[in-house]
Amino acid sequence: LNTPIQEGNNLYGVVTDPNGAPVGGIVVSDGFSCVATDANGVYQMPRHADAFHVFYRIPADREIPMSEGRPCFWQRLSKTQERYDFVLMPQQAVETDFKLVCIADPQVQKDTDLARFKEESVPDIRAHVSTLEGPVYGITLGDIIFNERSKDVTNQMMPPIALAMRESEIGLKLFQVMGNHDNCMTPTVTDESSNFDLAGRRNFEYKFGPCDYSFDRGNAHIVAMDDILLTDEKHNPSDYEGGFTDAQVEWLRQDLSLVPKDKLVIFCVHIPLRNATSFNRETVRNLLKEFDNVHI
């Protein structure tokens, strides 16, 4: 690396183009802090103890990277590795216009639900996308599956619904937002975090990546966040509040601090913010109010 790594920064790497040239100004995050790469393409930060991924904000002039038919702009963190590099593919031109298709609450719980989604919803979505001109992207707004107090279907339903949502099936690059029914009641993924709210979403993160992230398309800054706060240490998705932790608010503050105020901001969550003030919802709205044009 052409930039010295400061003491205490145990998460770092370099962002380059396909020719190995450094790319400066790229926002990189561990889900708790946001930093920008320097002129050498280097980022560095102290790794948060609960961090699960390192990821970058996809710039408007770069392609959306895909893996297994899904956007993949992250790397899962290991216990010992400190360096994680990224290669960004240039886009031919920054889009002046694009379409964003929002899909809410598939709530797949059993095989018949999955069959209906594949046989009815997917063809409808593909048909709609075919009528749209220009670039088209998609984002769910949570509750991809339907876990409830008496039935946890994470392992049964999340893999097949993820396959049904691949670009080759659904006809667009589809990002994800987490809903309350996407929380795993009894997490099967080993997680040493003492924060049970984080542990409840780990299986979702294994399949779809970070729950709090952002990306840019055209003149829009699109933010996706998990606004589900589990209140039951048994990870019961029926026991929750809508809102954000202090750590999430700080992540959002840092993310938005690196966005021009005249950019369009599209804020995607599962539970509508409405007029509620508790659990940091008013704080989040106040952060968004700093921008001229916001859609929630």
Regions found by a protein language model. Name each.
Residues 2-24:
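Structural motif
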Residues 3-10, 61-152:
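N-terminal active-site segment of His-dependent metallophosphoesterases
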Residues 13, 37-51, 86:
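Glycine-centered loop-to-beta-strand initiation motif
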Residues 22-46:
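Short, acidic Ser/Thr/Gly-rich low-complexity loop/linker segments typical of extracellular
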Residues 60-66, 71-76, 150-253, 259, ...:
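Extended active-site neighborhood of metal-dependent phosphoesterases/phosphodiesterases
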Residues 97-110, 219-233, 266-268:
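Active-site-proximal beta-strand elements of phosphoester/diester hydrolases
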Residues 105, 138, 143, 179, ...:
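Divalent metal-coordination and catalytic microenvironments
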Residues 262-296:
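Long, structured stretches of catalytic cores involved in phosphate-ester chemistry, encompassing
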